[in-house]
Amino acid sequence: MTNLRKTHPLMKIISQSFIDLPAPSNISAWWNFGSLLGICLIIQIVTGLFLAMHYTSDTSTAFSSVAHICRDVNHGWLIRNIHANGASMFFMCLFLHVGRGVYYGSYLFKETWNIGVILLLTVMATAFVGYVLPWGQMSFWGATVITNLLSAIPYIGTTLVEWIWGGFSVDKATLTRFFAFHFILPFIIMALVMVHLLFLHETGSNNPSGINSNADKIPFHPYYTIKDILGLILMTTVLLTLAMFSPDLLGDPDNFTPANPLNTPPHIKPEWYFLFAYAILRSIPNKLGGVLALLTSILVLLIIPLLHTSTQRGLMFRPISQTLFWILTANLLTLTWIGGQPVEEPFIIIGQLASILYFTLIIILLPLAGVFENRMLEPKFP
């Protein structure tokens, strides 16, 4: 009798992707984040679905419907806290996943990398529209400030903003359409994830050494299924600890106040995972320039494969590039800190210097380091 797992049209696809998939024998814990992101996505879709059953996307009832979920719905407080903090875990895993890709040269799988960047942008869009839904002060003003940035586009800007708003300000129409976007985007993300995996399985996984591992492959199950389960346990422990003990740790206190168009909060700032981009946006005094810098800060990831100058794939054996990579990491943490600070000295100048350093490291210094390291490795005969 033939094995159903290997012959059934649907089960065969699952088997080839998660059971019999040949994987490098030496991939480290940095390769766990892909599966963790998949789990995060499932958690967010499931909790989001239950929240959508009780939420109302109308300006007069949105805030109180969220309060109703937390007070009156069975375990509603838990579902909401898991969903809100699940977004933070999602971005934490995303940043580590992208960082791994940059460090180990995984971006040389160009199709997988480009789909990944599109996924990052889509997840950011989903998180942004989702943050507007509770209709608190920071939800309302965050939506107003960020959508207003589109007015910097020459000629069509103002029309575009009013078209997105569905009126002359952020109001009922905006909230309703943002709820629709927030509902549909995770399913688009799911489809993109499948394409991401499709391209990855065309080439097979990269590994820490950066060299071809075809000669030494092991089956995904049981080796990496067990390893992924360990990652899952650790992540869910952190998530549940956060959701149960300090669910509001990463949120903004202003969002406990219902949206009021007549009262501006003292400091308008997004959630922690957008602060680095927000700092880059604010570091340029010109509106259009800031918007372009904001976009470029993410889209620069698309040109990283073109900036690869080294003869080696990853940074495993390249100490100069490694140093620059960790400076870039520290720089991103600095930008995250600056994004949460008020617009005053010395934060303005620190933000501007960190923004310049961010682009300089990626576009100039890392490619130059690659060339320099190549020269150092050239054999020198007497």
UniProtKB/Swiss-Prot annotation:
GO terms for molecular function: metal ion binding; ubiquinol-cytochrome-c reductase activity. Heme b b566 binds at H97, H196. The chain crosses the membrane at residues 33-53, 77-98, 113-133, 178-198, 226-246, 288-308, 320-340, 347-367. It is a multi-pass membrane protein. Pfam families: Cytochrom_B_C (PF00032), Cytochrome_B (PF00033). GO terms for cellular component: mitochondrial inner membrane; respiratory chain complex III. Its cofactor is heme b. A ubiquinone binds at H201. Keywords: Electron transport, Heme, Iron, Membrane, Metal-binding, Mitochondrion, Mitochondrion inner membrane, Respiratory chain, Transmembrane, Transmembrane helix, Transport, Ubiquinone. InterPro entries: Cyt_b/b6_C (IPR005798), Cyt_b/b6_C_sf (IPR036150), Cyt_b/b6_N (IPR005797), Cytb/b6-like_sf (IPR027387), Cytochrome_b (IPR030689), Cytochrome_b_C_euk/bac (IPR048260), Cytochrome_b_N_euk/bac (IPR048259), Di-haem_cyt_TM (IPR016174). It is found in: Mitochondrion inner membrane. Heme b b562 binds at H83, H182. GO terms for biological process: mitochondrial electron transport, ubiquinol to cytochrome c. SUPFAM superfamilies: a domain/subunit of cytochrome bc1 complex (Ubiquinol-cytochrome c reductase), Transmembrane di-heme cytochromes. Binds 2 heme b groups non-covalently. Component of the ubiquinol-cytochrome c reductase complex (complex III or cytochrome b-c1 complex) that is part of the mitochondrial respiratory chain. The b-c1 complex mediates electron transfer from ubiquinol to cytochrome c. Contributes to the generation of a proton gradient across the mitochondrial membrane that is then used for ATP synthesis. The cytochrome bc1 complex contains 11 subunits: 3 respiratory subunits (MT-CYB, CYC1 and UQCRFS1), 2 core proteins (UQCRC1 and UQCRC2) and 6 low-molecular weight proteins (UQCRH/QCR6, UQCRB/QCR7, UQCRQ/QCR8, UQCR10/QCR9, UQCR11/QCR10 and a cleavage product of UQCRFS1). This cytochrome bc1 complex then forms a dimer. Heme 1 (or BL or b562) is low-potential and absorbs at about 562 nm, and heme 2 (or BH or b566) is high-potential and absorbs at about 566 nm. Belongs to the cytochrome b family. This is Cytochrome b. It comes from Glironia venusta.
